[in-house]
A protein has these predicted regions:
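Catalytic cores of RNA-modifying enzymes
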Residues: 1-179
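Flexible helical/loop "lid" subdomain adjacent to adenine-nucleotide binding pockets
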Residues: 159-205
């Protein structure tokens, strides 16, 4: 929970709180906390367990939400023990809203965390690595053993922190950059020129 303290003045948005494993620590902080949960039973539990959150529990699908409406367009820290099956989609959503998400922390599958933090030349370096590191500083904080869970999952977990780089400018069209990165890594067997030719058309050298 302390990983959110990089920006202590900002409100917190927790994604997928479930039964409040992380929420119980977040509500003790002297900050505005909102949670987004799509599961009805979890929402009912949270309302009963954390009455102080009553007006800040949002029953919705995070991936479909307009994040600019959550805190009147103001920035916030994104956190959560993210559902492993949609963690990549959550981070793509973060990138689409990077103007209001200066920091993102949380627990994800160890394999995904390693991909996000991977450097150029690494076997795990890919789309997530390039796109997130283009705008955020990535810190792989620590590994979480599967044995701390009951029942234990089949995979290890990891906690990471991504802090937006305020000084870095790409100097190119962001939409085109994302398209080139995704196309290039999805067609690794092709030469770079052949991969991006359909995108650039006549401008491709």
């Amino acid at each position: 929970a302390d990983t959110v303290d990089t920006f202590p003045e900002l409100p917190i948005l927790e994604v997928g709180p479930g039964m409040g494993v992380l929420t119980q620590f977040l509500v003790k902080k002297d900050r505005l906390v909102k949670v987004v949960e799509v599961d009805y039973e979890s929402v009912a539990y949270l309302r009963e367990a954390y009455p102080s959150l009553e007006d800040h529990i949002i029953e919705d699908d995070f991936l479909k939400m307009n994040l600019h409406r959550l805190f009147d367009g103001k920035p916030f820290v994104l956190t959560g023990n993210y559902p492993y099956n949609i963690s990549s989609q959550i981070f793509f959503k973060m990138l689409d809203n990077k103007d209001i998400v200066p920091c993102c922390t949380g627990m994800i599958q160890k394999e995904v965390a390693e991909r996000i933090a991977a450097g150029p030349g690494s076997k795990t370096y890919g789309i997530l690595s390039v796109l997130i590191q283009a705008w955020y500083k990535v810190e792989y904080l620590f590994t979480v053993s599967e044995h701390v869970f009951n029942p234990p999952p089949k995979v290890k977990s990891a906690v990471i922190r991504m802090t937006r780089n305020e000084t870095k400018e790409l100097g190119c069209d962001e939409k085109l950059f994302k398209q080139v990165v995704k196309t290039t890594f999805n067609q690794r067997r092709k030469t770079l020129r052949n991969s991006i030719k359909p995108i650039l058309g006549k401008d491709c050298p």
